[in-house]
């Protein structure tokens, strides 16, 4: 039975680390927009799951409960889109390295 080559394993780990740093930089650049109420409320989030902005159509400001519900729905929609984009970036970076797709299950992004 062949012994694993630890130098090769270390090299792979270093390459994976560099790719993950690249992914982190890409996630900072990604934005996703979610909307609710037919676009009456829009939320923009980053690929790192941070809310960047909320836009509310002034026409709906009379109904606070509806505004609150729509803000929650818009933010959740945007976060879901951002999580999908983050998974795509991680999948591209992980392709073939350290288990590829199976490794991504450990990140639990957006789940």
From Swiss-Prot:
Q: Which UniProt keywords apply?
A: Cytoplasm, DNA-binding
Coiled coil, from the record: none
Keyword Cytoplasm part of the UniProt annotation: yes
Q: Show the Gene3D superfamilies listed in the entry.
A: Nucleoid-associated protein YbaB-like domain
Gene Ontology terms: cellular component: bacterial nucleoid; cytosol
InterPro entries with a match to the protein in the record: YbaB-like_sf (IPR036894), YbaB/EbfC (IPR004401)
- Spell out the molecular function terms from Gene Ontology: DNA binding
DNA-binding as UniProt keyword: yes
Provide the protein's localization: Cytoplasm, Nucleoid
Q: Which residues form the signal peptide?
A: none
The entry describes its oligomerization and partners as: Homodimer.
The record's comment on protein family reads:
Belongs to the YbaB/EbfC family.
Question: What is its biological role?
Answer: Binds to DNA and alters its conformation. May be involved in regulation of gene expression, nucleoid organization and DNA protection.
Q: What is this protein called?
A: Nucleoid-associated protein Cphamn1_1179
**Gene source species:** Chlorobium phaeobacteroides (strain BS1)
